[in-house]
């Protein structure tokens, strides 16, 4: 279930601090669409399908009554944790995000409701404002 203002509600996601960093990363174009490009690459092998991934996520968010889904349809509007959780739910994926801020290194694992994921997707959140795809953990 998604909260109309902020996104998912009633979810449990896990974080693991100071764990091993990714062994290999696929760089993603940094043009304001990087979350959607990264998800596109992780799912289809082609980051150029980012507009389709963005549209599907927006459709999903609109179906839940999310208030900012229309704004998110614009090219180059950054994706956030809300969109990551929507992707986890609609694609039935565990979206694992590596974040490194100074000396704190954390894997954040975003799961679909009911923990029904069929496969994981690994992303890297670079300094809080860019996403790449982790290709080896």
What do the predicted segments below correspond to?
Residues 54-86:
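Cysteine-nucleophile protease catalytic domains, especially the papain-like/related folds used
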Residues 2-67, 91:
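Active-site nucleophile-adjacent alpha helix/oxyanion-hole segment immediately C-terminal to the catalytic cysteine
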Residues 5-8, 30, 63, 77, ...:
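Intrinsically disordered, low-complexity segments enriched in small/polar residues
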Residues 73, 80-137:
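Deubiquitinase catalytic domains
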């Amino acid at each position: 279930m998604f909260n109309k203002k902020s996104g998912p509600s009633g979810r449990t996601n896990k974080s693991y601090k100071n764990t091993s960093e990714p062994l290999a990363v696929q760089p993603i174009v940094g043009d304001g669409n990087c979350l959607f490009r990264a998800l596109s690459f992780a799912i289809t092998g082609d980051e150029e399908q980012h507009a389709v991934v963005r549209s599907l996520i927006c459709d999903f968010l609109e179906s839940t009554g999310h208030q900012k889904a229309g704004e998110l349809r614009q090219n180059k509007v950054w994706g956030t944790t809300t969109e990551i959780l929507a992707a986890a739910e609609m694609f039935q994926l565990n979206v694992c995000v590596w974040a490194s801020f100074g000396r704190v290194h954390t894997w954040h694992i975003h799961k679909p409701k009911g923990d029904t994921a069929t496969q994981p997707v690994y992303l890297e959140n670079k300094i809080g404002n860019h996403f790449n795809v982790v290709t080896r953990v």
